[in-house]
Amino acid sequence: MQVTETQKEGLKRAYTITVTAAELDAKVQEKLVEAQPDIEMKGFRKGKVPLAMLKKQFGPRLLGDAMQDAIDGAMRDHLETSGDRPAMQPEVRMVDGETWKEGTDVVVEMKYEALPEIPEIETSKVSLERLVVKADEAAIEEALKNLAESAQNFEDRRKGSKAKDGDQVVIDFKGSVDGELFEGGSAEDYPLVLGSGSFIPGFEEQLVGTKVDDEVTVKVSFPAEYGAKHLAGKEAEFACTVKAVKAPKAAELDDELAKKYGAEDLAALKSQISERLEAEYKGASRAVLKRALLDQLDQMVSFELPSKLVEAEAHQIAHQLWHEEHPEEHGHNHGNIEPTDEHKALAERRVRLGLLLAEIGRKAEVTVTDAEMTQAVLAQARQYPGQERAYFEFVQKNPQIQQQLRAPIFEDKVVDLILEGATVTEKEVGKDDLQKAIEALDEM
């Protein structure tokens, strides 16, 4: 077996691998000997079938396996000897693949881009500022007020009062399309909060200003993308009778409200809110700190990037942003989305930082534990209530999904490792300052 280098330019590598006919035949023979003890054939006892007969019957089938084993072995030996780590799966092409005949040498061309040498960084030269926000009384009171509004009740307005935006109207209604009532279009004593957006666009607005005992014909058009296809885009009329008009009344800030949210009393609820707010502030502060760290790391290192990785990342960015700008397009049945220079620049940054963090983690032997993976899978599974078991099985069968869950955990552990050696000072700020810092992340 012979491996000949045909290209070595920057990170680009190309080789010709030659497996001689004799080596290939020896591989086939090896597989036949390995299989012989388990093969039965008419006229022979199990394991006693002559190799010549086995080769005649099973040789063509084993030839492909032997060829693949030989090529894989040559590639593996080459990578171990050279120390190269391909950035992506090597491209392998069999020369004369369509015209190759048994008894001749197998010649394969292999191409790949090697991962670059990643320079060491001195974490002690990294200097960062961590924003610290305390949960003050005003923030706690604001959160309490929001909880009270979420737990609000509705009380009847004075007789003859007109419904306002935010009020609850209790209505009977019958919906029709082309003069015919349609299934699911009627209800009695239905409580509808005006302005909630829970009904078809334009419906709730036509009930603002109504009073008890008013009879109103609401005219609307079903959205073109409405779930019930037989109604999508159709004009409809709803005959409505207003039976009650109620004003919202926020719940009292007392122990009863606290018990609704699982706390023993109001003081305990305030304590829970304080802890939750500080956890939120801490998470937001970490996001700002991590971005600042990545910005510094990006300025500290410079090395050649595998062009194929950058190209793949740029296309992924362009594709993702296109779908964010076209949320109505759920599939991938669209033309090629060409990355812009901005996409390519962002891709280069992501690839550079990704390779740097991966190398730091590799050298420090950072790993993601089974317990950490289980927690990540559990967190994702909660998004599919009632289908948790199916999601677990889906993850178990998909290494790519496992890697998608593992990658951010690994990255955060490497970030923590770097922060341990960096100089990090704390700066106490208000929540508005933290919010501005978070908003600035989205603009970058």
Swiss-Prot record:
Q: Which GO terms describe its molecular function?
A: peptidyl-prolyl cis-trans isomerase activity
- Looking at the record, the residues that make up the PPIase FKBP-type domain are 166-251
Where would you find this protein in the cell?
Cytoplasm
Principal localization reads cytoplasm
Under the heading PROSITE patterns, the entry gives: FKBP_PPIASE
Pfam assignment, any one:
FKBP_C
Q: Which GO terms describe its biological process?
A: cell division; protein folding; protein transport
Tell me the keywords, alphabetical order.
Cell cycle, Cell division, Chaperone, Cytoplasm, Isomerase, Rotamase
The kind of enzyme this is, by top-level EC class, is isomerase
Q: Which InterPro entries match?
A: PPIase_dom_sf, PPIase_FKBP_dom, Trig_fac, Trigger_fac_C, Trigger_fac_C_sf, Trigger_fac_ribosome-bd_bac, Trigger_fac_ribosome-bd_sf, Trigger_fact/SurA_dom_sf
Enzyme Commission number(s) from the entry = 5.2.1.8
GO cellular component, as recorded: cytoplasm
Q: Which domain of life is it from?
A: Bacteria
The keyword Cytoplasm is assigned to this record: yes
Q: Please give the Gene3D superfamilies that the UniProt record associates with this protein.
A: 3.10.50.40, Trigger factor ribosome-binding domain, Trigger factor, C-terminal domain
Tell me the HAMAP family matching this sequence: Trigger_factor_Tig
Family membership, please give it. Belongs to the FKBP-type PPIase family. Tig subfamily.
Domain writeup:
Consists of 3 domains; the N-terminus binds the ribosome, the middle domain has PPIase activity, while the C-terminus has intrinsic chaperone activity on its own.
Task: Briefly state the protein's biological role.
Answer: Involved in protein export. Acts as a chaperone by maintaining the newly synthesized protein in an open conformation. Functions as a peptidyl-prolyl cis-trans isomerase.
What protein am I looking at?
Answer: Trigger factor
